[in-house]
Design a protein with these regions (language model features):
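Conserved ABC ATPase signature
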Residues: 80-85, 89
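Conserved ABC ATPase "signature" region
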Residues: 57-76, 128
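ABC ATPase NBD coupling module
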Residues: 1, 7-23, 41, 49
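P-loop NTP-binding/switch modules centered on Walker-like glycine-rich loops
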Residues: 115, 119-165
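Catalytic Walker B motif of ABC-type/P-loop ATPase nucleotide-binding domains
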Residues: 106-109
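A short, proline-enriched helix->beta-strand linker immediately N-terminal to the Walker B motif
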Residues: 100-104
């Protein structure tokens, strides 16, 4: 049985959905971020692809996003590489990239894995703030019941592909 519902959709349409409608926060920022490309290049590339704006406008949007997620001195940090950021700061970069096109839905896959408790709390506060200040919904994929208790108003559990429950 074919379960790929995106089959038949054009690549341009799928790309538009992926950035403008749905965005993703990945579990491991170092796997997502390219270690040999500056943060500026990685952030502005997606902004320019979706918003059709100038390099300067994309750079200004990247600075705005970095401020929004709590990265200090964003103008100077744009020129840095991912390895120059802490784990928590890299996760903030991933969140900023996810917010770049004002998506309607953000899927966060284990967004606090491998972060210490203090940074984890900061990231959860940031996700809470984002959902309160924007029209975006957030789906959190996690095994951490502390994250669930902190953020979720609806819980969907799936211990196996056949057994599912909503509470």
């Amino acid at each position: 049985r074919d379960t790929d519902r995106s089959r038949g959709l054009g690549d341009v349409y799928k790309r538009q959905i992926r950035g403008n409608d749905i965005s993703m926060i990945f579990q491991d920022p170092m796997s997502y971020l390219n270690p040999i490309v500056t943060i500026e290049k990685q952030m502005t590339e997606g902004i320019r692809a979706h918003d059709k704006c100038s390099k300067q406008e994309a750079r200004e949007r990247a600075v705005e996003l970095m401020k929004m997620v709590g990265i200090p001195a964003p103008e100077s940090r744009l020129k840095q590489y991912p390895f120059e950021f802490s784990g928590g700061m890299r996760q903030r970069i991933i969140i900023a990239i996810a917010l770049a096109c004002n998506p309607k839905l953000i899927v966060a896959d284990e967004p606090t894995t491998a972060l210490d408790v203090t940074v984890q709390a900061q990231i959860l506060d940031l996700l809470r703030k984002i959902t309160e200040e924007s029209d975006a919904g957030v789906i959190i994929i996690t095994h951490d019941l502390g994250v669930v208790a902190s953020l979720c108003c609806l819980l969907y559990t799936s211990p196996s592909p056949r057994d599912r429950s909503v509470s």
